[in-house]
């Protein structure tokens, strides 16, 4: 369902987003 798609996207996006957020903090 929709949550499955969002979860799949999150798994691909989070590894790229987390380092950027960590640098800003």
From Swiss-Prot:
Keywords: Amidation, Amphibian defense peptide, Antibiotic, Antimicrobial, Immunity, Innate immunity, Secreted. GO terms for cellular component: extracellular region. One of its GO terms (biological process) is defense response to bacterium. Its main location: secreted. The modification Leucine amide is found at residue 25. The keyword Magnesium does not apply. It is found in: Secreted. Pfam families: Caerin_1. InterPro entries: Caerin_1. It comes from the Eukaryota. Belongs to the frog skin active peptide (FSAP) family. Caerin subfamily. Antimicrobial peptide. Adopts an alpha helical conformation which can disrupt bacterial membranes. Strongly inhibits the formation of NO by neuronal nitric oxide synthase (nNOS) at micromolar concentrations. Acts by a non-competitive mechanism, probably by binding to calcium/calmodulin and as a consequence blocking calmodulin attachment to nNOS. Contains two amphipathic alpha helix regions separated by a region of less-defined helicity and greater flexibility. This is Caerin-1.9. It comes from Ranoidea chloris.
